[in-house]
Amino acid sequence: MDGKQSEITIREALASESAIILHHRRSMFRDMAEGTVEELDRMVEVAGPWLARAMADGSYHHWLAVDEADHVGGGGGVLLCPWPANPRDPCTQRAVILNVYTEIEFRKRGIARQIMLTILEWIKAQGLRGVNLHASAEGRGLYEKLGFEATNEMRLKF
């Protein structure tokens, strides 16, 4: 990219663009120093077929940030999971935001915020009443500014 900032458009990703989604997922974990090269390669190998199925059945939606030259500068997605209703939320689906990533040369331009606002509007339009995500240290400030709060979630790894 030259020094000029291009106009960014956020658009829904096509299933044929799964390679860029997987590239962003791998880059996200690499940037957080999560996983060895071999583990990241295996993750992409396993995630590819899952992503194709999830995009085909509508359980995963992804958006890309593209500039005027159609360079992809980032993206983010949402996974819709079956979930039992509870007293405060009668919905039987839960939305989980995943894979929010901005390429290094596109950072500090508000692109992650644009992606998140697009995803949040889409989730609201589906009639869902909330959304979860796991925040990296880099993303936590943005998510807090958007109104996300820490919860009482716990995890056990095997």
What are the roles of these predicted feature ranges?
Residues 9-23, 34:
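A short beta-loop-alpha structural element at the N-terminal edge
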Residues 29-50:
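Conserved GNAT-fold acetyl-CoA-binding loop/helix
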Residues 49-64, 96:
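A short helix-loop-beta-strand connector motif used in the catalytic cores of GNAT acetyltransferases and
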Residues 64, 71-80, 96, 101:
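Conserved beta-strand in the GNAT
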Residues 82-86, 92, 132-138, 144, ...:
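Conserved catalytic-core motifs of GNAT/GCN5-like acyltransferases
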Residues 106, 110-118:
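Conserved acetyl-CoA pyrophosphate-binding loop and the N-cap/start of the following alpha-helix
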Residues 123-135:
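Conserved GNAT acetyl-CoA-binding A-motif
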